[in-house]
Every structure is written in structure tokens, then in C-alpha cells.
Amino acid sequence: TIELGVIDWKEIFRDACWFHWTGITPALSENAAKVCLEAIQAANEMNITVSCDINYRANLWHYGKTAAQIMTRLVEGCDVIIGNEEDCEKVFGIKPENFDAGKTNGKVNQSAFESVCHQMMNRFTRCKIMAVTLRGAINANHNTWRGILCDAGTFYHSKIYDITDVVDRVGGGDSFMGALIYGLLTYTDNKQ
């Protein structure tokens, strides 16, 4: 098992400009959560951008702590957060304002995501950018997909992609995060 103090974060991060972690890591064990916090704190001290994907998986939290107890402290050290409205509600109790999922008829409600972004950025003040992916499931083989980025209250929306012949949805969030990190490192304008 991983233990506090074993990893020399200053050496690991010596040439780094970005540290990304996912909510799956602290869900695995209390030691993994502690080492994740240790890494975040070291990255913060070294002025390295820290990002996370909340990526809540209820079935992984089995060591006696809730996601809310652990994730709040970890996310406080993040500059960039990706998470959907369901993860934000289950982990932090943040719900979209003036939103009734039963009245959407399965369609993506952009204002719900914007509400969650505002609330998350107000709660986690270090966070300067929040992003979400919006997936509309037309059926098991046909989805729509778009991304939204919130930067200091300004929202940028990708076009809506119509994805047909879906074989497996696994990895969409990971690929989005990789592209987002690349974009934020490469372009000076978040609209790009």
C-alpha cells in the first residue's frame, strides 16, 4: 500500500507544470486519499496547476469515510475541476437551482450545468475553471455530446456532436480531460 512521506513530490514535480488526479484514487483507500492530498499540497506549494475529475463511484468508498469527508479537502486545492451535476450533488450536496430532471424529457439542460458550475466555483474559490461534458442518451447506440467550460462566470460551449454506433461509452471523460489540459496549456484564449 502507498504511504505518506514515501514519494518525494518536489523531485517528481521538478519539471512539471500540471498535476491531474481523479476521484477514483482517494476512493480506493484512506492512505491513497492522504497521499493524494500530500501531492496536491506539494503541487500548490510549487505553483503547479492542479486539476481533478470528481468521477464519483459510490461502490469504491468502503473504508469508513464518505466521499464528502475526503473530497472536499482535496478539491479545495484544485485550479481546474471537471464534474457533472450528479457527481457534484452526491459528493458536495450541490444541486442545480430551479431544475427538475423529470421535466427535461431526457434532453440535456444546459442551465442546470451552469448553475452547478457557479456554485462549485463559489464554494471552491481556488478553482478558476470548471468544465462538464453533457451527454444526451438517445438510445444505447446513439448519444449527443458537448462540453462546457466556465471561466470566471463566462461560459464557452462546444458544438453538439451527434455520435452514432456507440460501442462503449467508457473513457469519454478521460479523453475530454486530456484534451482540456492540452488546450489550456496550448492556447491563451479559453474560447479556443
Language-model-derived ranges and their functions:
Residues L37-N44, M121:
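Surface-exposed amphipathic alpha-helices with a cationic face
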Residues M46, L60-T154:
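Conserved phosphate/ATP/ADP-binding segment of small-molecule kinases
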Residues W18-T25, V50-A58, E85, A131-T133:
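Short beta-strands and strand-loop turn motifs
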Residues I2-D8, K34-E38, K65-I70, S111-S115:
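Active-site glycine-rich loop that binds ribose-phosphate moieties when present
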Residues Y156-Q192:
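Conserved post-catalytic alpha-helical subdomain immediately downstream of the catalytic base
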Residues T1-A33:
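Conserved phosphate-binding/catalytic loop of the ribokinase/pfkB sugar-kinase fold
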Residues N44-V50:
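Short, conserved structural micro-motifs that define repeat-unit consensus positions
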Residues P26-S29, A137, Y187:
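Short strand->helix junction
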